[in-house]
């Protein structure tokens, strides 16, 4: 029996060998080891080439290219070779005989050689693929979608057909590569329902994904970016896959992921730190323009000063060999780095002038914004840019492009525009989104200020244009009936237009759409309300109600955003205690998962509202945590770095003053002295005037001090001391500051008292003048940070008088006598 079995297997093997060797030409193709051998074989056997031979030859040519480093690939030479052209002609003639898999594979590989989408072979393959689409398997559909995406057909009916098929078979998809490829290509034609199904499917597949394939999660993150959908549970799974593969990533992959995270406003400190370290390791290994450009773009904004200088020196030696896209990437990175290397800026500006004519409008806008922010001193570049920008604006019929171009034109130094630009802006206003209108409002206001010499300015035309723009804004915002559209259009509005023109309409729309507020849009909605600086009780009550009810459905990372409007505006909703407790309990179990800077911001925001969860406070003021925070802040921009360090100091001060039982040490003395030194601006004329008024009221200039520094470095506008009979006490030494903690101690009732005490019954009085920033837009309710300062001053032993600048500058207080009477009443009749 065994002998018969062996004989049978041998017979079958011989049959297979004989069958495989019946196509000698295919056998010869399979043993080719270079493009030249393939072309030689094709040239000698054109008449004998079957559809199988053609497909195998094209696939083999791409295989050889793929195995080479990018810098050594010869795509252009292969594409222009006569035998490759012959292969394309043969393929076009044999399309109807191709198997489904072969058809898709040939289309995919032909596109790898940068064959244009309008090429007849590509068009015929696409049309045949469309005809066969319903019978394609999942792998073929996915690869076909990739081919369409590379031809910029994301919004085409054909892609819509693919999305419809995916909707029907999504439950059967079990391959993350197939799913992620489909997601990133059909994003432009899917419904919100299909989007959510795709996200859920990706979320489930990530649990079983081989983490070594980091391109799959990268495409998923790209899909989320394209959909503007920050779904954090899925993002975190993708991020975990990236963390496990950073050692295998090159600058290009790291640059792509960092860019995607920025677009999604997603930050993960562990990834940033590991990515920075990986990129620093590769600095000396990147010795060509392509790789060094990607390294510069990824590492530059995260690098320390020494590394930045090294990167700038390196990029300066390579800049002459850069193509237009690389120059644009470097310029954008320099802007993000706040680069001040004048030699590099000038060289980039000089090279850009050669390519301005080939950049798209959005790229021209990025260039203009960057060179303005970098303070470029190249008048010729500005002049060329203005001409090209105006030409693009006049020829464009896309409202978003017109608005974008108008905004950047107005940012150019001494820009003068002609009436055709104004006419174009006038014509597209009714079609503009709120974001577009905001950009145009900014541009028009700048043109008004520069006194544009045209009939639009001389006859009030620019004023009329601005009036029409405002009318369009009012009409558009009142017609919006979906809160997600409302948030999308207002998300990127910058400048004063929202505050000065649309604010009341925006709040009215919030009230009108209040029933559409859900746990899904709550964080973004809360951030918008914070931006408005408008205290609308019904809207804030709704936010608190939804958050309290559905807090378990909301990602813990969003807790800070939800709390923000309440603590900033100093508003406690009817269910205030339950709301704050729900938020606190929701986030406490996840402190180790939050980025360090977000933990600091969260703790500070709760401190504004007088909430000091011990677990949170102890987590912040921990040596290991502060070390992680320092490491993270090194990767931030200087502006964000300073902001977080300031919040940490303010939190440290609040805990020391309001929760001494926690025994958290004060460790910001040197930091505050540095801040004090940098901010030493002297006394303003208004302060000097009020100081004189106080001197007349109190009996002399030496009875009041100006710009007083307290323990823990609060600055008081004015200070005086009254005895138990409310009589002023003279300051013997005007130059002595009260910032020495060695002179104070804790007294009864939780107040700090000076060890060298005041006379019995005496009281320090702090007089604080609050400008408009201390109040919400629509009420006299004092905002959270100013109420915190008042609490702290009272703990330090002060009686605090907070005087509104609006009240001080009112018609009722328009004379010196009125000011003095007002101050006298506040100082001597307020209960001390």
Swiss-Prot record:
Where is this gene product found? Mitochondrion
Q: What positions does the domain RAP occupy?
A: 765-825
InterPro entries assigned to the protein according to its UniProt record, in alphabetical order: FAST_2 (IPR013579), FAST_kinase (IPR050870), FAST_Leu-rich (IPR010622), RAP (IPR013584)
GO cellular component term, pick one: mitochondrial matrix
Q: Which GO terms describe its molecular function?
A: RNA binding
Q: What is its main location?
A: mitochondrion
Annotated Pfam families:
FAST_1, FAST_2, RAP
**Which biological process, per GO, is one annotated for this protein?**
mitochondrial RNA processing
Mitochondrion in keyword set = yes
Is Cytoplasm there in the keyword field?
no
Keyword line: Mitochondrion, Transit peptide
Give the protein family.
Answer: Belongs to the FAST kinase family.
What this protein is reported to do is described as:
May regulate the stability of some mitochondrial mRNA species.
Q: What is known of its domains?
A: The RAP domain seems to regulate mitochondrial mRNA levels.
* Record protein name field: FAST kinase domain-containing protein 1, mitochondrial
Organism field: Xenopus laevis
């Amino acid at each position: 029996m065994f002998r018969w079995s062996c004989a049978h297997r041998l017979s079958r093997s011989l049959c297979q060998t004989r069958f495989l060797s019946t196509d000698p030409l295919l056998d010869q193709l399979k043993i080719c080891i270079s493009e030249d051998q393939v072309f030689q074989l094709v040239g000698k056997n054109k008449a004998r080439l079957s559809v199988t031979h053609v497909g195998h030859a094209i696939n083999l040519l791409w295989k050889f290219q793929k195995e080479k480093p990018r810098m050594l690939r010869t795509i252009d030479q292969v594409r222009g070779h006569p035998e490759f052209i012959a292969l394309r002609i043969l393929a076009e003639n044999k399309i109807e005989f191709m198997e489904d898999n072969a058809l898709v594979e040939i289309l995919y590989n032909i596109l790898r050689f940068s064959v244009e989408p309008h090429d007849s072979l590509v068009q015929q393959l696409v049309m045949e693929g469309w005809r066969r689409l319903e019978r394609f398997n999942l792998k073929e559909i996915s690869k076909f979608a990739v081919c369409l995406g590379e031809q910029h057909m994301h919004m085409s009916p054909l892609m819509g057909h693919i999305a419809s098929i995916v909707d029907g078979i999504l439950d059967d998809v079990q391959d993350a590569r197939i799913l992620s490829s489909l997601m990133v290509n059909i994003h432009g034609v899917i419904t919100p329902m299909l989007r959510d199904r795709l996200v859920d499917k990706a979320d489930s597949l990530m649990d079983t994904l081989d983490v070594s394939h980091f391109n799959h999660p990268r495409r998923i993150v790209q899909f989320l970016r394209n959909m503007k959908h920050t779904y954090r549970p899925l993002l975190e799974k993708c991020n975990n896959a990236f963390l496990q593969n950073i050692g295998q990533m090159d600058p290009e992959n790291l640059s792509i992921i960092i860019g995607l995270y920025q677009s999604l406003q997603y930050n993960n400190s562990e990834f940033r730190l590991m990515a920075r370290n990986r990129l620093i390791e590769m600095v000396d290994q990147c010795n060509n323009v392509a790789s060094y450009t990607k390294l510069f773009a990824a590492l530059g904004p995260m690098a320390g000063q020494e590394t930045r200088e090294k990167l700038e020196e390196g990029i300066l030696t390579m800049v002459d060999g850069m193509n237009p896209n690389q120059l644009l990437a470097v310029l954008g990175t320099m802007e993000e780095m706040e680069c001040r290397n004048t030699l590099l800026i000038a060289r980039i500006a000089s090279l850009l002038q050669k390519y301005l004519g080939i950049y798209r409008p959005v790229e021209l806008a990025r260039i203009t914004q960057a060179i303005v922010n970098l303070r470029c001193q190249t008048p010729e570049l500005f002049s060329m840019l203005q001409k090209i920008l105006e030409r693009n604006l006049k020829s464009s019929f896309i409202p978003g492009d017109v608005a974008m171009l108008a905004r950047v034109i107005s940012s150019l130094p001494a820009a003068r525009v002609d009436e055709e630009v104004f006419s174009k802006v006038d014509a597209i206003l009714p079609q503009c989104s709120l974001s577009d209108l905001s950009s145009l409002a900014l541009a028009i206001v700048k043109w008004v200020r520069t006194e544009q010499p045209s009939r639009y300015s001389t006859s009030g035309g620019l004023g009329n244009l601005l009036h029409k723009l405002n009318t369009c804004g009012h009409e558009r915002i009142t017609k919006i009936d979906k809160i997600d559209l409302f948030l999308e259009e207002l998300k990127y509005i910058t400048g004063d237009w929202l505050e000065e023109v649309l604010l009341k309409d925006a709040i009215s729309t919030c009230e009108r759409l209040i029933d559409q507020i859900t746990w899904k849009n709550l964080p973004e909605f809360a951030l918008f309300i914070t931006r408005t600086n408008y205290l609308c009780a019904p809207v804030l009550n709704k936010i608190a109600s939804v958050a309290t009810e559905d807090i378990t459905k909301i990602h813990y990372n969003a807790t800070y955003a939800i709390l923000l409007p309440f603590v900033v505006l100093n508003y406690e909703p009817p269910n205030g205690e339950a709301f704050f407790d729900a938020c606190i309990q929701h986030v406490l179990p996840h402190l180790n998962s939050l980025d360090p800077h977000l933990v600091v911001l969260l703790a500070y925001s709760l401190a504004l509202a007088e909430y000091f969860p011990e677990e949170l406070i102890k987590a912040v003021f921990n040596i290991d945590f502060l070390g992680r925070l320092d490491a993270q802040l090194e990767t931030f921009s200087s502006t964000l770095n300073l902001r977080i360090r300031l919040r940490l100091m303010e939190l440290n001060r609040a805990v020391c003053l309001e929760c001494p039982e926690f025994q958290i040490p004060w460790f910001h003395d040197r930091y505050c002295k540095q801040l004090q030194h940098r901010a030493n601006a002297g006394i303003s004329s208004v302060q000097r005037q009020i100081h004189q008024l106080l001197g007349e009221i109190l009996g002399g200039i030496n009875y009041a001090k100006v710009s007083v520094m307290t323990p823990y470095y609060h600055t008081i506008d004015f200070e005086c001391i009254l005895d138990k009979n409310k009589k002023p006490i003279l300051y013997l030494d005007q130059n002595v500051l009260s910032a020495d903690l060695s002179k104070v101690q804790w007294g009864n009732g939780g107040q700090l008292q000076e060890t060298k005490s005041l006379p019995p019954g005496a009281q320090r009085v702090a007089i604080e003048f609050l400008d408009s920033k201390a109040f919400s837009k629509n009420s006299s309710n004092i905002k959270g940070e100013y109420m915190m300062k008042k609490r702290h001053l009272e703990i330090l032993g002060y009686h605090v008088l907070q005087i509104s600048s609006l009240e001080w500058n009112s018609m009722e207080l328009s004379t010196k006598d009125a000011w003095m009477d007002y101050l006298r009443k506040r100082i001597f009749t307020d209960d001390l």
